[in-house]
Amino acid sequence: LDPILVTRHLHYSLPYRALFARMMRRDTVDRLIDALVVLLVRLHLVGFFWGDCSLSNTLFRRDAGAFAAYLVDAETGELQPKLSSGQRSHDLANAEINIAGELMDLQAGRLLDDSVDAIATAEKVVERYDSLWTELTSWEAFDVNDRWRIARRVERLNDLGFDVAELDIVTDIGGRTVRLQPKVVDPGHHSRRLLRLTGIDAQENQARRMLNDLDAYSAATDQQGEDEEIVAYHWVTDAYEPVLRVVPKELRGKLTGPEIYHEVLEHRWYLSEQ
């Protein structure tokens, strides 16, 4: 029998060229680059060498004002126990070259704002990757009496959307200095928490926004001392679901439920500023 490959359609996703159907502004380009950097870091953390990182080989989904990126073309990829710094650098070099070429192609088609420097934007990939990779994997040394810095490091990673499942903590021979390094880092901190509390499957930034709204709902309804799961249930029934119910049926398939709710929160904020 001939082999076949069965693929799964990624709903609500778009190739980057569809996002550039109209003139694209600098801030939107930056958000695309940020999403691609997060994807590349996540792949490298699990030992996946992409081999051909580019905007063309990526799909994007809207994520509460940002984008979430997904690997599409993996025919050049290799899954290994751990990537060397040389392999990671090779992926980054390919990404920089490919993205610069893709942005220049968009400029030639007058689909990119003149203020966007294709070369400089592509170079930012390496800078942003190094910054995120360092935050997720680097050693940090501090005095043995400053153990509160362990919690602060974990909180910083949570803010970036990553859970820390394991830490490597070493104390020097003199017992005065502690060295800390995250060992097992999992993306999706906020989306996992939202799913646990509400059963709603959302992108990371959508989940972050909805959890903030859940906290605001808890304060507004004087439920801050109640069990978190109970408050979350009331928030879903009193806030989230009523918003989705009023969306016309013919428009419900345009965006995911969490993205619709984010748009409503944005609109509510703009109205409050007037």
Annotate each predicted stretch with a short phrase.
Residues R22-G51, L55-S56, L92, E96:
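Conserved kinase catalytic-core helix
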Residues A21-R25, P81, E250, K254:
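A short, mixed-charge helix-start or loop-turn motif at secondary-structure junctions
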Residues L10, A74-E75, S138:
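Fold-independent oxyanion-binding glycine-rich loops
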Residues F49, L55-D105:
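Catalytic activation segment of kinase domains across protein kinase-like and atypical kinase folds
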Residues V37, L45, G65-A66, E266:
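Short, well-ordered loop/turn elements at secondary-structure boundaries
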Residues L1-I33, A69:
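Conserved structural core of kinase catalytic domains
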Residues D105-Q274:
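Regulatory N- and C-terminal appendages and interdomain linkers associated
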